[in-house]
Amino acid sequence: MDRVYKSYCKQAVITFALAFGFALIVNWGVLQLFGQKSADRAEHSLVGIILLMAYIALRAEKKEDQRQAVGVFFLALIPCYFGTVFPDLDITLFAIGGHRNPLFHSSLSFFLLVFLIGREQRFLQTLVAGYGVGLASHLWWDVLDYGDVRWLPGGVIDRLWLGVHGFLCLLAPGSRLLRGSGSGP
């Protein structure tokens, strides 16, 4: 029994190391593609890629799903990156003094996209789910790193706002990713 546990742990560590290495390489490629050099941008996009990998892995239940997961990952990758970027567009629009505007640092843009695509467009659902994962990762990273949302009083409410909205971004269209036409999370 102890040998089986050690073998399982070794396999888990190797899998994690390979996945993390892959995430670093993909992150570097995405940053190069969009000409990004900021350390903050690199952090946000790496966290987004790692969360996207975990999100897809958790949804790939059957062997057929596992084979399809690679395609879903690459299809959702660029929208995921856009999700990691979107909250910081408030800097461009309102300057740094308006950064962490609650409209940009929320799930509002995600649910607007969900509403616009409807429930029947599986391809678009994959893109929007990727965006939602990227947005969720940005919001959750801000909980750990900054957490100061404009116009909300105190650090606890700010972090609660970011955390809840990050969670909401992982709902909706992703419930049917990598699954047949059935429903459920």
Where are these regions (language model features)?
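N-terminal membrane-targeting hydrophobic helices
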Residues: 1-185
